[in-house]
Amino acid sequence: PRFVRELAMPALDSGVEQARRPDRPRIITASPLITGPDVDAVDRSRQTQRAVLAFLYSTPAYQRTLELFGWPELGPRLRTMTRNGDWASLGALMTDEVLDTVLPTGTWDQLPDILEGWYGGLVDGLLIQPPEDPSLDARFSETLRAIGSIRPRLD
């Protein structure tokens, strides 16, 4: 949510003003989540997201995000590791603090309240990735119904 508030929304507001638009564009967030039906699945998701973020944050495109959260040295360290072919060690730099700061984390039962806390009143919608296992769809649909009641952004 901090990225949306401090970087994305000011940029959108500036663009709206420059274009003399009567309203702001809709904001739909597609943030990755650390989630699953139970604690073990959340732990597995955490490890997957640790590896994904380590790779993404090794690219210069994410340097501004790292600076926003007070980790300006993290990107260059990750880039050095990728240049040296040290792919296996990237995840070690992605601490739990980093993950918990940038990604909503919790079981499916906890997720609606967590997302309300992160994004309620801030965005117009949330893009949520369904589980890979279709046998979990019915259970996940309950979570999606609850997420559907999150307060949208009000202009």
Q: Model segments located where?
A:
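Active-site-adjacent structural elements that line small-molecule/cofactor binding pockets in enzymes
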Residues: 1-155
